[in-house]
């Protein structure tokens, strides 16, 4: 028995792995940017930091996955957007520190290599990288029979960006009286899906719920996470933003306080929050308490900005989209987030 046959009998298809690499090359090529060194397939991805033109560079990194949203991608057999979710979860975190994404690496683990399916996943990763301006410089596809079912896979990523040292955003400049501006989310994004799956466990995904304005449920649930890089970078370059919050797991309550010092709080005008239809549906069909929704979901705001009052108009001018003035920074009395 040859070594190749022995490995195949253990459930690992080396040839399928080679096919995956060949299939994804054209998607990786879409993401190339200045600074990338070497070619796909080396032992390590390389990037020339001097090509960024940043005078005092500070590297900012972030890593994340997609959580159980993957289970819906598998259930509905739709794999071409889940990669964008993975990129978004990483690059939105580093943009919150004032960093421009430079490059990205992905990790896919599966029970059985399916080259067509994995190409779809990586095509979504590449699309996310294009939207973020980040190069996909490497990754790993691990076939692990026995660890995962044949149709199952997991996806995670790692992003590195660069910030000018003087432009790092850490919330230390946020002060009482600053205005909180919200940028719309595209949907649920990539958090809260254990609850989402429970609420809609008995649904096929083809339902046209009245709250969803003619869209099939599965399309709304798998709407890819918005990437905020191109919206936020011009604001960072002009130093118009004092704090940025990526509204992920924990919703408003957990994420907004990460934007400012412990002696401050956020006062939110709930009437100004652009709540998306899917959140109204989740609250209704899941019988979820209204206040708990703000502890779990983004509620229609995926990125929060803390801005000086005198800079609000300039920020709105630079952003070619609706901007929601949903709150302000106050002195902390008790709670870190007060929703009125």
From Swiss-Prot:
InterPro entries membership: PurM-like_C_dom, PurM-like_C_sf, PurM-like_N, PurM-like_N_sf, PurM_cligase
Keyword Ubl conjugation (UniProt): no
EC number(s) stated in the UniProt entry for this protein: 6.3.3.1
Subcellular compartments: Cytoplasm
Top-level EC class as recorded in UniProt: ligase
Reactions catalysed: 2-formamido-N(1)-(5-O-phospho-beta-D-ribosyl)acetamidine + ATP = 5-amino-1-(5-phospho-beta-D-ribosyl)imidazole + ADP + phosphate + H(+)
UniProt key word Hydrolase: no
Keywords attached to this entry: ATP-binding, Cytoplasm, Ligase, Nucleotide-binding, Purine biosynthesis
GO BP: any one term: 'de novo' IMP biosynthetic process
A Pfam family: AIRS_C
Signal sequence region: none
GO cellular component: cytosol
Domain of life: Bacteria
Biological or metabolic pathway of the protein: Purine metabolism; IMP biosynthesis via de novo pathway; 5-amino-1-(5-phospho-D-ribosyl)imidazole from N(2)-formyl-N(1)-(5-phospho-D-ribosyl)glycinamide: step 2/2
GO molecular function, one term: phosphoribosylamine-glycine ligase activity
Family: Belongs to the AIR synthase family.
Protein name: Phosphoribosylformylglycinamidine cyclo-ligase
């Amino acid at each position: 028995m040859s070594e190749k046959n022995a490995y195949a009998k253990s459930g690992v298809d080396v040839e399928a792995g080679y096919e995956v690499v060949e299939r994804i090359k054209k998607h990786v090529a879409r993401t190339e940017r200045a600074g990338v060194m070497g070619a796909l397939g080396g032992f390590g991805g390389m990037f020339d930091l001097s090509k960024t033109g940043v005078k005092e560079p500070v590297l900012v990194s972030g890593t994340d996955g997609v959580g159980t949203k993957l289970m819906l991608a598998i259930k509905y057999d739709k794999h071409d957007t889940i990669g964008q979710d993975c990129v978004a979860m990483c690059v939105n975190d580093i943009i919150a520190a004032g960093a421009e994404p430079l490059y990205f690496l992905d990790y896919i683990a599966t029970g059985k290599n399916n080259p067509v399916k994995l190409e779809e996943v990586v095509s979504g990763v590449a699309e996310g990288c294009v939207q973020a301006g980040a190069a996909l410089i490497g990754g790993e596809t691990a076939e692990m029979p026995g660890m995962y079912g044949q149709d199952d896979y997991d996806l995670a990523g790692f992003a590195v960006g660069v910030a000018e040292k003087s432009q790092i955003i850490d919330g230390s400049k946020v002060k009482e009286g600053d205005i909180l501006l919200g940028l719309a989310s595209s949907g649920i994004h990539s958090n809260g899906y254990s609850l989402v799956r429970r609420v809609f466990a008995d649904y096929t995904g083809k339902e046209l719920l009245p709250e969803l304005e003619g869209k099939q449920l599965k399309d709304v649930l798998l709407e890819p996470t918005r990437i905020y890089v191109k919206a936020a970078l011009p604001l960072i370059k002009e130093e118009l933003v004092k704090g940025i919050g990526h509204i992920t797991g924990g919703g408003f309550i957990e994420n907004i306080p990460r934007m400012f010092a412990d002696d401050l709080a956020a006062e939110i005008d709930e009437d100004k929050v652009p709540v998306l239809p899917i959140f109204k549906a989740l609250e209704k069909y899941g019988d979820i308490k209204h206040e708990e929704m703000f502890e779990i979901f983004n509620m229609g705001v995926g990125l929060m900005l803390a801005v000086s009052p005198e800079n609000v108009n300039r920020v709105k001018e630079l952003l070619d989209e609706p901007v929601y003035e949903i709150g302000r920074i106050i002195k902390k009395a008790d709670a870190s987030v007060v929703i009125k």
